[in-house]
Amino acid sequence: MIKVGIVGGTGYTGVELLRLLAQHPQARVEVITSRSEAGVKVADMYPNLRGHYDDLQFSVPDVQRLGACDVVFFATPHGVAHALAGELLDAGTRVIDLSADFRLADAEEWARWYGQPHGAPALLDEAVYGLPEVNREKIRQARLIAVPGCYPTATQLGLIPLLEAGLADASRLIADCKSGVSGAGRGAKVGSLFCEAGESMMAYAVKGHRHLPEISQGLRRASGGDVGLTFVPHLTPMIRGIHATLYAHVADRSVDLQALFEKRYADEPFVDVMPAGSHPETRSVRGANVCRIAVHRPQGGDLVVVLSVIDNLVKGASGQALQNMNILFGLDERLGLSHAALLP
């Protein structure tokens, strides 16, 4: 049985991680931390978990207790894992970080986007970017895994086949992405209030979103060179989901793009390339660790449109983190994640 610790268990990614781990046959949550809710039972805060974690209580972070776990997940704001990851690694505990702390390879670039110095630059070289469809073999050997963000997951999975094949003009990529409100986190913010977010949609961070350098980094690795990406995120009045509409110029009209995508993801348990002409819906992935993709070439022209949908809390966060844990410990990566999406 894998002994699991969770740092930061009161946010949406934390409770989603608890929900998924409750169904995992080879993992047990030993420690879950929250400074603000220390002493409170998990099942009292989250009634949906009654019967699964009736005796588990939130506690103040304790490196000794966390270090006794086989793996520790960080479901925290950026900056927290910087302070604790090194000590846990020294104790022999593996770390899976759902925050942005170790996603970017360049400490200076991280500091520019997050407005503070990187707190653990010495760990960046060994941090493995946890996108299994790209880095599965590296994940198997990792001590420290950086779980990709939600927008980066949907965008990279949608564009990588075109870039790996050298088909797309990498200098003119567009990612037009929509997110549910849970992507903004559980903290109280005016923009997330029902009367603000309901029955409305808006773009934000058009000048530059923190996920932009992460997406660009992944696309550069796929293409083997520089990329030019315009990324525009939007907030939509739904709770869960990411819908990415991706645009790339592909001059070669003889390529069977449907076959290209089907071949690239043929052995991927959590990527579903839908039949030609499909329009994937966010509701088709709600609660599931799956990315559904459809590829289109409107009017048979040079502009290719890829539609990519995920649940931002599952394949975009906690489900992908659990998928990484399964790979890390040599398990079937579908373990605890094979359930169907919720519908309606």
UniProtKB/Swiss-Prot annotation:
GO terms for biological process: L-arginine biosynthetic process. Pathway: Amino-acid biosynthesis; L-arginine biosynthesis; N(2)-acetyl-L-ornithine from L-glutamate: step 3/4. It catalyses: N-acetyl-L-glutamate 5-semialdehyde + phosphate + NADP(+) = N-acetyl-L-glutamyl 5-phosphate + NADPH + H(+). It is found in: Cytoplasm. Its main location: cytoplasm. The keyword Oxidoreductase applies. It holds the Pfam family Semialdhyde_dhC_1. GO terms for molecular function: N-acetyl-gamma-glutamyl-phosphate reductase activity; NAD binding; NADP+ binding. SMART domains: Semialdhyde_dh. Belongs to the NAGSA dehydrogenase family. Type 1 subfamily. This is N-acetyl-gamma-glutamyl-phosphate reductase. It comes from Pseudomonas aeruginosa (strain LESB58).
